[in-house]
From Swiss-Prot:
It comes from Alkaliphilus oremlandii (strain OhILAs) (Clostridium oremlandii (strain OhILAs)). Pathway: Aminoacyl-tRNA biosynthesis; selenocysteinyl-tRNA(Sec) biosynthesis; selenocysteinyl-tRNA(Sec) from L-seryl-tRNA(Sec) (bacterial route): step 1/1. The modification N6-(pyridoxal phosphate)lysine is found at residue 298. Keywords: Cytoplasm, Protein biosynthesis, Pyridoxal phosphate, Selenium, Transferase. It catalyses: L-seryl-tRNA(Sec) + selenophosphate + H(+) = L-selenocysteinyl-tRNA(Sec) + phosphate. InterPro entries: PyrdxlP-dep_Trfase, PyrdxlP-dep_Trfase_major, SelA-like, SelA_trans, SelA_trans_N_dom. It comes from the Bacteria. It is found in: Cytoplasm. The gene is selA. Its EC number is 2.9.1.1. This is L-seryl-tRNA(Sec) selenium transferase. The keyword Translocase does not apply. Gene3D superfamilies: 3.90.1150.180, Type I PLP-dependent aspartate aminotransferase-like (Major domain).
Length: 467
């Protein structure tokens, strides 16, 4: 047996297409996909054959049935949605890698109506003329925040870039060194500022910035003071920063506008529910800040969006900036954001129906009761595992409330038959992927980020992956 002989034993594309199992497959999978997977499988075998040494050639066999099984499996894998639902058992509420905020179940009908049909996206129904897509959300944002006007773009980095490009292109913007944040993915505020065309003037030190530092940096080229809320980290100890109100007064003294990026977009005072202080959008607006930017998909609990609120004078200018077109949001984002914001008209309703707020404010006692239910379901299956309930801490995530530790209860699972790493791996690769934590040789599932309707899926997953 030599490599040439083995190559001759490989089936051709046409031979495989004429196989009965493949013919049946083409009845449910597009032919183009099947042909693609056949060609890739043949190429994979060719590469493997080329890598064989003399001793391996002797025992090498071409198993046609195995090739067909692999092709069928690969075809179905290709047709599966890559972007799909997962179960978040990590306890990190705003898990960036798992999609951050969950949209409220209560808004799906409004979003679907807009998604599946024609809509009033850019039409003025009263006048029968072209309208603005931004009018759909600007009124409710203004009502909730108390701002003069509002504009929505596709994320908060875009919001900051649009604001700076409009208000400070080729001009200077003064920013404290202690607020030069990196917002994730290696994107940094100074980089966003440079891309906008604004010139950074950094003042103070990492841990201390005084009001006089801002004043000393003012020049005839100063276009704005910028405050960036350090929502994804905290500097503790020997520190000092300038309050927003102080900076606003300084801005009025020199006729310099104040821009504040508050990041997470809190619309409810979370301290009332046992969480740490996080500045609300309403506080920034009422303090006199000229322009405030924040995210839609963090603590606000809506879709990914960058929301700009503040003085109408500046927002009107932003609407004329060509970047607004590049950064504009689609009808799905508009529909989801408007419907989410409507829930804020009743604070109790917002806390109950917006998943992010509900998860953040759920008490440890409530989570414990839910943990008992899931634990009982797992134990009743008589699986080859040791399962227990333990106290633990959840995290907020998403670059929000970095020091916050939320008391929670978790299910700890230790398998008697497979390793913890293998168990975690199998759960993650389950058809509905289950993400967990691993600690002390146990798989940890935090109930804070688990929905009751997901319990059955979790139990079924354990049944299958431990077999």
């Amino acid at each position: 047996m030599n490599k040439g002989k083995i190559f001759s034993m490989l089936p051709s594309v046409d031979q495989l297409l004429n196989n009965e199992a493949i013919i049946s497959l083409i009845g449910v999978i597009p032919r183009s996909v099947v042909v693609k997977e056949i060609r890739q499988m043949i190429e994979e075998y060719r590469k493997n054959i080329l890598m064989l040494n003399e001793s391996q050639i002797i025992d090498f066999e071409i198993d046609i049935e195995e090739i067909i099984r692999k092709i069928i499996k690969n075809c179905y894998n290709f047709m599966d949605m890559n972007l799909r639902e997962v179960i978040n058992g990590t306890g990190t509420v705003l898990h960036t890698n798992l999609g951050r905020s969950l949209l409220s179940e209560s808004i799906k009908e409004q979003v679907w109506d807009v998604a599946s049909g024609y809509s009033t996206l850019e039409i003025d129904v009263t006048e029968g003329k072209r309208g603005s897509r931004y009018n759909h959300v600007s009124e409710i944002i203004k009502f909730i925040t108390g701002a003069e006007d509002a504009l929505v773009v596709n994320n908060n980095a875009a919001a900051v870039m649009l604001v700076l490009s409009t208000m400070a292109k080729d001009k200077e913007v003064i920013l404290s060194r202690g607020e030069m944040v990196e917002i994730g993915g290696s994107f940094r505020v100074p980089d966003v500022m440079a891309q906008s065309g604004a010139k950074l003037v950094d003042i103070g030190t990492t841990n201390k910035t005084h009001l006089k530092d801002y004043e000393n940096a003012v020049s005839e080229d100063t276009a704005a003071f910028l405050k960036v809320h350090t929502s994804n980290y905290k500097i503790l100890g020997f520190t000092e920063s300038v309050e927003v109100k102080e900076l606003v007064n300084m801005g009025r003294k020199y006729n310099i506008p104040v821009i504040e990026d508050i990041g997470s977009g809190v619309l409810i005072d979370l301290q009332k529910y046992g969480l740490s202080y996080e500045p609300t959008v309403q506080e920034s607006v009422s303090s006199g800040v000229d322009i405030v930017t924040f995210s839609g998909d963090k603590l606000l609990g809506g879709p990914q969006a960058g929301i700009i609120v503040g003085k109408k004078l500046y927002i009107d200018q932003m609407k004329q900036n060509p970047l607004t077109r590049a950064f504009r949001v689609d009808k799905l984002t508009m529909a989801a954001l408007e419907a989410t914001l409507k829930l804020y008209l009743d604070e109790e309703m917002a806390l109950q129906k917006i998943p992010t707020l509900k998860m953040l404010t759920e008490t440890a006692e409530s989570i414990y009761e839910r943990a008992k239910v899931l634990h009982s379901m797992i134990v009743s299956e008589k699986l080859d595992v040791v399962a227990g309930i333990a106290k633990d801490y959840s995290e907020v995530g998403g670059g929000s409330l970095p020091l916050e530790k939320l008391s929670t209860y978790v299910i700890e699972i230790e398998s008697k038959s497979i390793s913890t790493s293998k168990l975690e791996n199998r759960l993650r690769k389950y058809r509905t992927p289950i993400f967990s934590r691993v600690r002390d040789n146990k798989v940890i599932i935090d109930l804070r980020t688990i929905k009751p309707e997901q319990y059955e899926i979790i139990v079924q997953a354990f049944n299958e992956v431990i077999q």
